[in-house]
């Protein structure tokens, strides 16, 4: 089992902290981390020279300034920041933002996504997927609604005790993926699987709130402990510009093909 697939407690530092990169994980292209600010550390600035960046506000409220414009972020709001544009994040209270980035050759427009107005009631972006015991809500925050080269970002929220990422599927030839877990109250936990062959899984570990898992190969379902949900932010990175930037197009584990993924 590889130790650089699991990153525990990604929220243990304030400021802008890039937790996983191609240098310390199995990722080929994607880097990701957290921006956590409060009244003691209310502002950070970031360079964005050769990469596109996505931001998703997990908790609190803050503002993002890009190119002379300012955008207010609260729960599940998102930002797409193009290559070559620096940005500043400011809060006067508390904000916790998940950041993902990857290199690209192309430049796309800045795009702000308001979760309540743009995503929550949009049937193309909010998907109610599966059935008991694998029911979950998928919110696509940065997806086909936003012009970009490689990155997608959103959240999956399960019912207590349910499976997600079910039926088991994989996309190793086209995309790498991050799962960052949130809102899993203690003593609840989840269990994350990654395997090409179920008889000898590459990864099978309990995961807690603020843990992150990098997925570069294999089927990757997870399950919540009874009475508790398993919720996570996901970030997908296409292995090529403008090629596999989609949530769908996955390979379902043989034997489970009759169960719809609901991914599109």
Segments predicted by a language model, with ranges:
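Acidic/histidine-enriched, beta-strand-rich ligand/metal-binding domains
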Residues: 187-264
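A short glycine-rich, His/Asp/Glu-containing loop-to-beta-strand
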Residues: 11-44, 129-178
């Amino acid at each position: 089992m590889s130790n650089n697939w699991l990153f525990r407690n990604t929220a243990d530092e304030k400021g802008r902290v890039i937790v996983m990169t191609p240098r310390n994980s199995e990722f080929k292209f994607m880097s990701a981390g957290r921006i956590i600010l409060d009244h003691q550390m209310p502002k950070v600035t970031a360079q964005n020279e050769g990469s596109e960046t996505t931001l998703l506000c997990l908790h609190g409220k803050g503002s993002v300034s890009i190119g002379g414009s300012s955008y207010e972020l609260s729960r599940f709001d998102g930002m797409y920041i193009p290559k070559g544009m620096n940005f500043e994040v400011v809060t006067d209270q508390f904000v916790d933002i998940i950041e993902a980035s990857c290199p690209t050759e192309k430049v796309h427009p800045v795009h702000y996504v308001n979760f309540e107005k743009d995503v929550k009631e949009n049937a193309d972006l909010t998907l109610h997927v599966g059935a008991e015991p694998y029911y979950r809500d998928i919110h696509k925050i940065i997806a086909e609604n936003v012009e970009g080269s490689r990155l997608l970002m959103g959240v999956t929220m399960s019912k207590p005790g349910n499976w997600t990422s079910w039926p088991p599927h994989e996309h190793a030839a086209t995309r790498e993926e991050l799962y960052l877990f949130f809102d899993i109250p203690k003593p609840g936990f989840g269990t994350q699987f990654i395997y090409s062959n179920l008889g000898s899984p590459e990864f099978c570990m309990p995961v807690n709130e603020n843990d992150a898992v990098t997925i570069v190969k294999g089927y990757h379902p997870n399950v919540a402990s009874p009475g508790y949900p398993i919720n996570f932010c996901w970030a997908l990175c296409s292995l090529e510009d403008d090629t596999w930037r989609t949530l769908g197009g996955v390979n379902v584990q043989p034997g489970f093909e009759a169960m719809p993924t609901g991914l599109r």
